[in-house]
Each structure stands twice: as C-alpha cells, then as structure tokens.
C-alpha cells in the first residue's frame, strides 16, 4: 500500500513496479523502474528521502527507515534480502544484502558487494566496491568485578 505523508507523495519512474498488497511505502520515497517491494516490507521515508534504483527488490519483512540527514540511497539491481533492516545508508549498484542483516546510519556499501546473512554494519562503516562482508564483530564493553558476581 502506498501512503502520502504530509505533502510527500511516493514517486515512481514509469508504471512498471510491484508493491505487495501488505507492504507499506510512505513519505519521501522514489521507486525506480522494475522495482519490487514484497510482502510485509515497510519503506518509511518520514523524515528523509529513500531512493530505490531501477531493477532493485526489497524482500519480505524488510524495514527501511531514515533519520534527518541520513537518507537511504539504493543503486540499481540491488537485492535486499528477507528481514533486512536498513537505516540511513547507501548501497551501490548490483549489490546483495543477505537475509536478516542490519545496516545502520551513514554506512556506505560500494558496487558489486555481497553482504552475508546476519551481518551487522555499524554506523559510518565504509565497504569498498567488489567486497564480500560476513558476520558481526563483538567485543567486551564492560566486565563485572569479582565482587559483583553472584
């Protein structure tokens, strides 16, 4: 379903696109030719723009959202896998974002990249063209003192 938010209407390039009946697209969103948005996906351009390039697809249950000053720009022929969370990032042409990945504000992913399933890219990460990225790095932020343990 396409919704208008305030004065912002969703823009489409041509008539050749698909939005599943229970997908939600609203606000400052531009869909290129041959874009598809699948079941349960939410594309919410409420405070900044979201541009999805020609031939790209947003798979089931993915969420695209923005912050002021952090738009989402998705290049051409990009696949955003099932249950992906994109927030204020840029994705280059011919890239694939794997199932259940989380891409945070101001991340820049180059052209021809593969982001593996369940990958977390933290704010401001830059991924060069032709890269394969998988997993998420965690580290200890705080350790309890011996006397604090039960």
Regions found by a protein language model. Give the residues of each.
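Intrinsically disordered, low-complexity regions enriched in small/polar residues
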Residues: 5, 19-20, 140
């Amino acid at each position: 379903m396409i919704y208008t938010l305030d004065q912002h209407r969703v823009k489409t390039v041509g008539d050749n696109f698909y939005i599943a009946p229970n997908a939600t697209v609203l606000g400052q969103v531009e869909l290129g030719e041959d874009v598809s948005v699948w079941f349960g996906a939410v594309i919410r351009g409420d405070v900044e723009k979201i541009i999805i390039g020609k031939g790209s697809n947003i798979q089931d249950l993915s969420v695209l959202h923005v912050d002021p000053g952090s738009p989402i720009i998705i290049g051409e022929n990009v696949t955003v896998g099932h249950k992906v969370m994109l927030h204020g990032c840029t994705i280059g042409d011919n890239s694939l974002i794997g199932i259940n990945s989380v891409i945070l504000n101001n991340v820049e992913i180059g052209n021809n990249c593969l982001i593996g399933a369940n990958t977390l890219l933290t704010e401001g990460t830059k991924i060069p063209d032709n890269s394969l990225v998988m997993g998420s790095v965690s580290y200890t932020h705080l350790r309890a003192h011996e006397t604090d343990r039960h």
